[in-house]
Amino acid sequence: MSGRGKGGKGLGKGGAKRHRKVLRDNIQGITKPAIRRLARRGGVKRISGLIYEETRTVLKTFLENVIRDSVTYTEHARRKTVTAMDVVYALKRQGRTLYGFGG
């Protein structure tokens, strides 16, 4: 294994990397009805029109923080796959303990 690290099964010199489409503005995929449903589940009766953009902003920030911590745990364990336990530990670190996903 010529310096390929853990699990280097590849033949040849490496080949081209696949390109992934750059994802922009996907936060708009959290639709107005989806936010309404979440609010209803939380017991909200009426919703101001300004709530939707603010909710998207807060959700994006929250997910960025959780994902950043999860990826940190993954990299520390020298893995390439984020596991459910990485997310559980990331949430616990932020003071939001989640039960039911192992550990």
UniProtKB/Swiss-Prot annotation:
DNA-binding region location: 17-21
Residues annotated as transmembrane: none
SUPFAM superfamilies: Histone-fold
Location(s) in or outside the cell: Nucleus; Chromosome
Record's keyword terms, sorted: Chromosome, DNA-binding, Nucleosome core, Nucleus
Self-association state and partner proteins as the record states: The nucleosome is a histone octamer containing two molecules each of H2A, H2B, H3 and H4 assembled in one H3-H4 heterotetramer and two H2A-H2B heterodimers. The octamer wraps approximately 147 bp of DNA.
Pfam hit, one: CENP-T_C
Nucleus recorded as keyword: yes
Protein name: Histone H4
PANTHER family listed in its UniProt record: HISTONE H4
Molecular function GO labels: DNA binding; protein heterodimerization activity; structural constituent of chromatin
CC per GO annotation: nucleosome; nucleus
Function of the protein: Core component of nucleosome. Nucleosomes wrap and compact DNA into chromatin, limiting DNA accessibility to the cellular machineries which require DNA as a template. Histones thereby play a central role in transcription regulation, DNA repair, DNA replication and chromosomal stability. DNA accessibility is regulated via a complex set of post-translational modifications of histones, also called histone code, and nucleosome remodeling.
Segments for region (Disordered): 1-20
Keyword Transcription: no
SMART domains noted in UniProt: H4
InterPro entries on file: CENP-T/H4_C, Histone-fold, Histone_H4, Histone_H4_CS
Family: Belongs to the histone H4 family.
Organism: Chlamydomonas reinhardtii
Gly residues bias locations: 1-14
